[in-house]
Amino acid sequence: MLLAHWHEHLELVYVLEGEMTAYSQDSVYELVSGDLFLANTSEIHYTHTHRGTRYCLLQIPPAHLKRITPDWKTLRFQEYIMHSEESGSLSGRLGAIFRSMLFLQERKGQGDQLLLLSEVFRLLYLLDTEAREEKSSGRLEENVRDLERIKQTMEYIQDHYQEPLTLSDGAAFLSVTPEHFCRLFKKYTGQTFLGYLGQVRMTHFYEDLSGEDKITLLLDRHGIRNYKVFLREFKKNYGQTPQQVRRKIS
């Protein structure tokens, strides 16, 4: 599972085979073959790929988004486009573009990069004309303000995850009540504060399994105090115990 994150690129995930769970702020989408997930600019999102899943991931940089509008940061497209067998459906046309891009990427013939770029613009055209969403300026400004505060909190967690952080620490960082902080964090990340903190710790722990330090030392280093709960979540995410993962990657 990828950690919740954000970027200025427009990100699209097209599922070729298998299943995937996608999270965008407080929305959850269960994707299957032919479905498309779209993470809008600067919105917090993450995905969980199930075993055996194949997918295409495309990130479209701001330079291309500016061709749609100078105010590209406010662009919002439909996040989830479900696969449809109906002739001429949006999902079918977008899927054909992704398959074409995949073919061109693998062929790597002369001029294929230009053809690939033309497919990106064809995709953007379909999104702009058939999947664009409009939000009121007042609501958008409020969302942007709150979203920036939550991003600052996530960066704070990344910097201090090894410490014994609590919900009260997160609320104090934003100078709000714990109740308001809970609602705000859940709204923009789709996770609880403690759930996200646990994921950050688990990710750093997993990365260090390739080293030689004892597992008990890694647990302590990354602020993990309840091993029983951690082990359950680790097996849910990676399908194995830390010891099994270490043997596999050693």
For the regions a protein language model found, what residue spans apply to each?
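Generic protein-terminus/edge-of-domain signal
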Residues: 1-32, 36, 49-51, 69-78, ...
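N-terminal hydrophobic signal/anchor transmembrane helix of membrane proteins
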Residues: 3, 111-113, 246
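Residue at a beta-strand N-cap/secondary-structure junction
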Residues: 21, 164, 212-213
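A hydrophobic/aromatic-rich effector-binding and dimerization subdomain
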Residues: 38-107, 124-136
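Short, Lys/Arg-enriched, Trp-marked, Pro/Gly-tolerant hinge/linker segments that flank
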Residues: 79-90, 105-116, 124-155, 159, ...
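Short helix-to-turn junction characteristic of helix-turn-helix DNA-binding domains
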Residues: 101, 157-160, 208-209
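Basic/polar phosphate-binding segments, predominantly the helix-turn-helix DNA-binding elements
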Residues: 158, 164-202, 219-248
